[in-house]
Amino acid sequence: MIGTSRSWRSHASGLAVATFLLVAADPSFAQTAGAQAAPAATPQGAPAPAAGTPAGDEIVVSGIRQSLANALNIKRESAQVLDAISAEDIGKFPDKNVGEALQRVTGVQITRAGGEGSGVAIRGADPALNRVEVNGQTQLSTGAGVSSRAVEFRDIPSEFVSRLEVVKSATADMTEGGLGGTVRVITRRPFDNNGKPFLAGSAQTVYTDLAKRWDPKFALIGSKTFFEDKLGILLSGTYEKRSLWYDQARTTGWRQVDRNQPVMAPACTTDRIGVDENCVDIDRNGFGDFFPDIPRYVINRELTTRYAFNGIVEYRPVDNLKLFVEGTYTRGKQKLNSQFLQLGTVQAATNGGVSLANTTLGEDQTVSHVRFVAAPGTIGTAGGLSATYRNILGTIDRQNINSQVGGDWDVSDRFTVSARGSYAKAKAVNNEINATAAAQGLAFIDVDYSGSSGAPNIVLPIDPTTTQGLTQFIVLRRPRYNNQTEKAGKIDFEYKPESFLTSIRFGVQKRDVDVTSKLYDGTKTYNGYVAGTPGQGNVTLANYATGSSVAQVVSTGSNAAILQQIQNIVQPNFDLGDHNFFNTGSLGFDGYQRFLNLGMDVANAAGVPDPFGNLNPTDTWGVYEKNIAGYVSTAFAFEPAGIKVSGVLGARVINTKTESRGSIVTGTGLAARVSPFSQKGEYTEFLPSVNLKAELIPNKLFARATATEVIARPAPSDLAPRFTLDSVGFTGSRGNPSLQPYRAKQYDFGLEWYISKVNFLSATFFRKDISSFVDRTTQQELINGVNYTITLPVNGTSKVQINGVEVGSQVAFDFLPSILKNTGVTANYTYSKDKGYNQLDYFTGGALTFPGLSRHSVNVSGYYEDSKFSIRMSYNWRSKYLIAALDRGNNPAVGAAFGQWDGSASYNINDHISVFLEGVNLFHAQRTENANSAYRQNIVETYGRRIYGGVRAKL
């Protein structure tokens, strides 16, 4: 396994940092449960902040134990099943971005991009299936690829945030859209400081050991009230630069080989399980053997500049009226350079084969070493084996605008009216340039997987640090423009009768969501070989079988002028860079440490094509949604047999109308025609919910039970009439405007034992019955004479049930002697298991789990705190999970088990200034993905360790 093969140096350096962190200071974090603070409506049955008392006073994070005690009090009073994390001082989250902070919550797992937390899965639900709100307003997606609903948490500044909540049981007043749950991001407010002026800031630097760079980050926030605390203003801003470098050893997919030719076959001719007479079966056990498809190395470099601004004005002209207006603007600008060395082994499906004499079968029907050899007559031609140097260059510009206006009017002591109007816009521009240089017509390529990491070690008959053998150069520019907007308004009414019904609430909401995506294409190609021209010599069958032929055959179809032009473009402009590949520990990797880097200078020298006259009609589309909802709910409290019982009962009705717009292509070749396409849809959902709580032992033992129905809408790109093709892998994808939403019934039953002010133990059983979801299927389509494997989304036909248990605890060791009394532990564990998901491994027929679901996940944090010093060490781990049932080559894609150590320490110089040191991924954990086998790795990724240091100050 990856974790057992880390180098001694990696452990030693990580241990040194961890040791320092264990002698220096303050995480200030807590897991809590509480009601949403104003200005968003407070859920029924949840404790509301008292008038004039800031919500922050409920769970103040001035010390670990005090914050935990306050957290338990809020959780005890809450009507819903939820967890939260809060912070008093600027930047004092347990982790360095909002996504990473959420991974400490029971039942939450995160996805990472370049080692940073970027997406949040709740109880196995994919990040795109969970709703994210900022002060009750929808946070839209800024994905730069195909449009999704998954929120990019890296662009939400943690310094703006007062509290994060993960709501796992819905109430009728909540906006629908969270299949797993809803993440509430609640920002600081002008009246949080009891009318006193507030000013805080931080300055820090971060060192990323792969990039070997120091980057800055600054934050400032201030608030003040005026006119005898009737008017409050808060302004805040952040700025940061971030250098992310992460290395990947990839294998794009795994395929079987036809032994009659013997050449690579897209999936042999096996329908699913076993082999027929055409499939290579080295050990003759009746099962086809797996060979790698497009092994490659990738060095990813990202330089990101982020800045954000937040402004809030609150006005309280009279005691019973509160008005507000707020706005947030965030922007992240990335410069990208992803440097590839990859093999075109898919081309071997027609122009190459496998030398069985130089191939070794390893475990699980998977080759551990393979030699690909050129087919007869293809050495020195455009159709032979190839090695490709590829760089994805360009910029990604993400922008998010959130604005909201609203108010709360207490008409009387019993009747309240609340109204909100909001506008949100998310924009992502991916100005991508793909520069590719290929060395074609190679005699052989060796790939070895016998190292402990499972990463491919590639051996070429050419030197990858030179321009030797380059015969083709392509520059492809494909800018994509994604836009999402939401216009929303709602009004809520609440009446508080004097009876066992403590609250009756009803209201309406309207949301218009518009998503568009435009893709442009522009390509410039230099071909030094004429495709299909045979070489001057024939390769004998004996040489073909052993791979001993040499690449010294000159193609009669070569164009010397173009070959020289390619060299003139590449030679003066390429560089190897100063980065050694996979340099955080070998992990058994001894492949190429450097290879050609085709940077922007190479693309410019080739003449970067202007794509804007070439709109791609089949991947330019729009999806519009009109949602109108109404709800009614009631909160109640009574005492049967002396046991206090309270809860919230309600129902929500939503009507959704959709329209998918785009283009379709009919005919092929010169007869192809592009026509506009539009499809409308409509559905209405009825979503009942009940949340119950019983106080079995006063103030000590509580029982909770919930039953709710929830929905989540498919990704806009799945609903779009879009169609894309990959001419390298002979694959493609389509959208499906007829998709229905995800639908599920959810149940919770839990016990919470409040042992003392800070000590706590809980266990919650949950069940999710998913009656409708989106799955993937494939079909073969003949397009322009070529057979493509097309993937398209469909509604799953099975009924899936997920059962799980969440266990959480907090223990303060204040009963121990000496300094041990200042220590404590927080921990949680989640177990989840599904049944009914009917997708199988295409090749083995084995059962697959529901996508995104880890069976086990664990979070453990230990802390020490006194009046000056505070430290925390945390470990987060999740077991393997399914990413996609049908990935490249019909293989499943599986995320392997992953665990990571983080730590933080701080020292309070005085009441106003503190210094801190924090480390992320202290022991260089590697992330891996595979094709449902540890011996068929798809991705082995290393992103190194990040160290933060800085100072915080407040007045």
Put a short name on every predicted segment:
Residues 4, 528, 823, 877-886, ...:
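C-terminal beta-signal and adjacent terminal beta-strands/loops
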Residues 60-93, 119, 127, 137, ...:
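N-terminal periplasmic "start-of-domain" segments of outer-membrane beta-barrel proteins
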Residues 99-141, 168:
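Extracytoplasmic beta-strand/coil segments of soluble accessory domains associated
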Residues 145-150, 159-166, 173-272, 301-309, ...:
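Outer-membrane beta-barrel translocator/receptor signature
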Residues 187, 203-206, 214-225, 293-338, ...:
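Outer-membrane beta-barrel transmembrane strands
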Residues 260-292, 354-385, 446-472, 530-619, ...:
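Flexible glycine-rich, low-complexity coil/linker segments exposed to the extracellular/periplasmic environment
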Residues 398-400, 619, 623-625, 711-770, ...:
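Outer-membrane beta-barrel signature, preferentially recognizing the C-terminal barrel domain
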Residues 767-769, 781, 786-885, 923:
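Gram-negative outer-membrane beta-barrel transporters
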